[in-house]
Amino acid sequence: IHEGGHLDNLMTSVVFLVFKNKLIIFTKQKLKFIPELLSNMVLRDANNFMQEVLLKIMQKDFHVMLDDLRGVKEKIDDLDSKISTSGSLRPTFGDLLTLQKYMIALSTTYKANHKALDFIKKNFTTIDDIDFSTKKIIDELYDTSDTMDRIILGYSQYLDNLENMINNMISYQLNMIMKTLTEI
């Protein structure tokens, strides 16, 4: 999570185009794993090149997103311990807002990936000769996608509760200050 990062910079779009049996991949930022993945890839069936590449990239992409979620968990834990030790300070509130912004970006990305997965499943299942391993990969991707959706929902709810707690702490502190000033 970049300090002061803009929402647009938190996501990387990947566009796949198929033109005359060639797969063209466009990204805003260079994704290091794509060339490495393609150079080490062994095709099961040359006739299903596009399908295999798309599924392989989606698998790797989902793995990267799960790692990102682990990083978010660490950031949430850090924020939680900051609140416990120092109270609701301005930097803590800024960190909370940054995390919430990042959660929005992740949620949007996951929804887009789920739609892409729906498209892939719809188009692959119309192919009569789809093999068992391809179906298995698609099912695993759906399971991973559902898991990420549940995790992101849980983290978002937790951050919302943290925000409420911070607001309550600030309100309490202001009330105590006003009470002290009134007594003076």
Task: Map each language-model feature to its residues.
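Membrane-associated alpha-helical segments
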Residues: D78, S88-I184
